[in-house]
């Protein structure tokens, strides 16, 4: 299984190129299903081994260059300078490649303390040829690498040429001083002789047992639907799933542009290429056969769909039929593995007509497409058990006297602090825009404008649909703002963090300085967001990672955690909307509910019946579930 591979081993597409003195490829061997292994030979020298299933090729990791700009897309290049050869890795699960590169970098750095043997010494040793895969990274490797770095960082002492440090991973000194623009900073900078940051042992954020169960089910090839209440780590798990699958055949999608941006994907409608999907099936199949769209459908082996609750049943059935038709397969969804995520007790499907839209689980093809239904039970966003219980009750439409009393009492909460006001969650987009515009106008002082830099101004509408930041941002001193990107998790500078503009830097740019609720004061600089467009095109937007935060819509708040939030539920018009709004708050103390009416708390009865059936089936299937979970899931609420 893919998930059980060693961190020093990759399964991917590999190309081995022999280069002429000008750096051009004169011979190329392509291995579609190759294995790349990091190991040591009989002299404990580090070796990169490429195996095509027949005969291995070994490359000495001595004088080489590492190009990792596209590591996030599962690609990297290792160039062996003396041999005039380069190994190009592609279609590798990004998370696995990231760990492989860190292992290579730190292990190589740690091995520089030993003096290399000469060819004569190797002949005299007479050792039989050997190859052993390197062990996983340990603390001693990091400590050894840091010790060597500290020596390099020490003041230079006069020395003879014979005392020069042995080869650098990045090649000769000229290349180190002027690194190529396609060299990513992560593993390369870690080995830069002039800049030696302290290394730490790379540790991925640990998955819970139930999250691990979902990941293992996905890696075993099952079609999986996993659900859970707000704050159970669904989006976090989806990112781990995306990073664990081969990029070329994996398509991450979501029902909304904002949700798609969170997982680094595109909208489901953009992937499908059939517009709104309202056309007859035959016409939709024709639309999906256009060259750019057809490539999506034929190359896709793993389709991820986030926020499935907002996907309508008829649209899902059409996609399933299109997949079978285009891929010429009778298997459900044309044999594509489905990884579906969402909470049907949150926002329902969007429909423009008066006719009621059905949920995905009510579609004809749902049961034959989904092999496993799994539920995340552990709430991670909130830690207060009382607040968690309140949210669980609201989620299923159960409003007790105690819940009502707590929410009515919250109207008196004073949640403003250090000039940072509560963000008002609104049910309608128009209310949000009007509130933010009026509040900004009421502030004294000059408006500062910040225009986004887009990679393709002709496709600005596509970017707008997926971007968490606007084309034009207007700010004043005192403007209430919200961070739209994780900048420094340790300091609390995370997506959704609240702040206020305190001043602007002098000069043409006039960058804003923001004081955040966590206590940090930060000068905000432009950040870049990448988006996937139809046809495999990548788009980008550079903008300040801020948005006005006097008000925000409930739809736009999905996936966010807010420190101080004010909610008016008077105009709630959809089932699940009240729950989504309330569950954005990190704590009950940071929540203020105005004009609360228990009648606005609604849960769709069809969804409740579906979840009850899902839980019964899960209990019946528990013996097979244990293969993935290791132990029975515990429930934290009773319906």
From Swiss-Prot:
UniProt keyword annotations, A-Z: ATP-binding, DNA damage, DNA recombination, DNA repair, DNA-binding, Helicase, Hydrolase, Isomerase, Mitochondrion, Nucleotide-binding, Nucleus
Catalytic activity: Couples ATP hydrolysis with the unwinding of duplex DNA at the replication fork by translocating in the 5'-3' direction. This creates two antiparallel DNA single strands (ssDNA). The leading ssDNA polymer is the template for DNA polymerase III holoenzyme which synthesizes a continuous strand; ATP + H2O = ADP + phosphate + H(+)
Localisation: Nucleus; Mitochondrion
Binding-site positions, ATP: 228-235
Lineage top rank: taxon: Eukaryota
CDD domains: DEXSc_Pif1_like, SF1_C_RecD
Manganese is among the record's keywords: no
A GO biological-process term: mitochondrial genome maintenance
Ranges annotated as DNA-binding: 577-596
GO MF, one annotated term: DNA binding
GO CC annotation: mitochondrion; nucleus
Enzyme Commission number(s) of this protein: 5.6.2.3
CC cofactor: Mg(2+)
Subunit record text: Monomer.
Family per record: Belongs to the helicase family. PIF1 subfamily.
Protein's job: DNA-dependent ATPase and 5'-3' DNA helicase required for the maintenance of both mitochondrial and nuclear genome stability.
Name recorded for this polypeptide: ATP-dependent DNA helicase PIF1
Source organism of this protein record: Danio rerio
Lineage: Eukaryota, Metazoa, Chordata, Craniata, Vertebrata
């Amino acid at each position: 299984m893919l998930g059980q591979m060693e961190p020093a081993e990759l399964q991917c597409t590999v190309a081995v190129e022999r280069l002429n003195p000008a750096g051009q490829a004169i011979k190329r061997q392509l291995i579609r299903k190759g294995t790349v292994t990091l190991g040591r030979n009989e002299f404990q020298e580090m070796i990169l081994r490429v195996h095509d299933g027949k005969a291995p090729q070994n490359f000495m990791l001595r004088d080489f260059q590492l190009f990792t700009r596209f590591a996030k897309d599962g690609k990297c290049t290792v160039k062996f300078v003396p041999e005039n050869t380069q190994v190009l890795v592609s279609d590798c699960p990004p998370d696995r490649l990231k760990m492989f590169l860190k292992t290579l970098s730190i292990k190589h750095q740690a091995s520089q303390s030993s003096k290399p043997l000469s060819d004569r010494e190797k002949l005299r040793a007479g050792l039989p040829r050997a190859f052993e895969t390197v062990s996983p990274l340990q603390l001693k490797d990091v400590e050894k690498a840091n010790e060597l770095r500290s020596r390099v960082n020490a003041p230079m002492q006069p020395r003879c040429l014979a005392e020069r440090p042995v080869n650098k991973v990045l090649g000769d000194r000229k290349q180190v001083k002027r690194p190529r623009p396609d060299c990513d900073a992560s593993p390369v900078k870690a080995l830069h002789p002039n800049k030696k940051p302290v290394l730490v042992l790379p540790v991925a954020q640990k998955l819970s047992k139930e999250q691990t169960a979902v990941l293992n089910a996905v890696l075993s090839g099952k079609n999986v639907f996993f659900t859970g209440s707000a704050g159970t780590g669904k989006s976090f798990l989806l990112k781990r799933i995306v990073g664990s699958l081969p990029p070329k055949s994996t398509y991450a999608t979501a029902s909304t542009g904002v949700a798609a941006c969170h997982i680094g994907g595109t909208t489901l409608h953009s992937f499908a290429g059939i517009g709104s999907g309202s056309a007859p099936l035959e016409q939709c199949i024709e639309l999906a056969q256009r060259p750019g769209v057809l490539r999506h459908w034929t190359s896709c082996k793993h389709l991820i769909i986030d926020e499935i609750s907002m996907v309508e049943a008829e649209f899902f059935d059409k996609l399933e039929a299109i997949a079978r038709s285009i891929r010429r397969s009778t298997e459900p969804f044309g044999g594509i593995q489905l990884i579906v995520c969402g909470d049907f007790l949150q926002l329902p499907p969007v429909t423009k007509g008066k006719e009621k839209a059905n949920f995905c689980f009510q579609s004809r093809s749902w049961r034959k497409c989904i092999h496993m239904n799994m539920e995340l039970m552990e709430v991670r966003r909130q830690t207060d058990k009382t607040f968690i219980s309140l949210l669980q009750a609201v989620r299923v439409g159960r409003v007790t006297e105690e819940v009502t009393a707590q929410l009515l009492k919250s109207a008196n909460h004073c949640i403003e602090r250090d000039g940072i006001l509560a963000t008002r969650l609104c049910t309608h987009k128009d209310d949000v825009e009007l509130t933010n515009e009026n509040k900004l106008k009421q502030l004294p002082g000059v408006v500062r404008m910040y225009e986004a830099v887009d990679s393709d101004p002709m496709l600005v509408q596509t970017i707008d649909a997926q971007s968490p930041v606007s084309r034009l941002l207007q700010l004043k001193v005192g403007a209430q703002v919200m961070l739209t990107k994780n900048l420094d998790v340790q300091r609390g500078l995370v997506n959704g963090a609240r702040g206020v503009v305190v001043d602007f830097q002098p000069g043409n740019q006039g960058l804003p300085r923001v004081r955040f609720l966590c206590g940090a004061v930060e000068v905000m600089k432009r950040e870049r967001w990448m988006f996937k467009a139809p046809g495999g095109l990548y788009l980008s937007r550079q903008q300040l990672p801020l948005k006005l935060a006097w008000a925000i819509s409930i739809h736009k708040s999905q996936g966010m955690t807010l420190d101080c939030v004010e909610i008016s539920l008077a105009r709630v018009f959809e089932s699940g909307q009240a729950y989504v709004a309330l569950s954005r708050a990190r704590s009950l103390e940071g929540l203020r509910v105005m004009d609360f009416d228990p009648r606005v708390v609604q849960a769709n009865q069809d969804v409740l019946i579906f979840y009850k059936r899902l839980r019964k089936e899960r209990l019946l299937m528990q013996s097979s579930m244990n293969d993935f979970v290791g132990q029975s899931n515990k429930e934290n609420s009773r319906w």
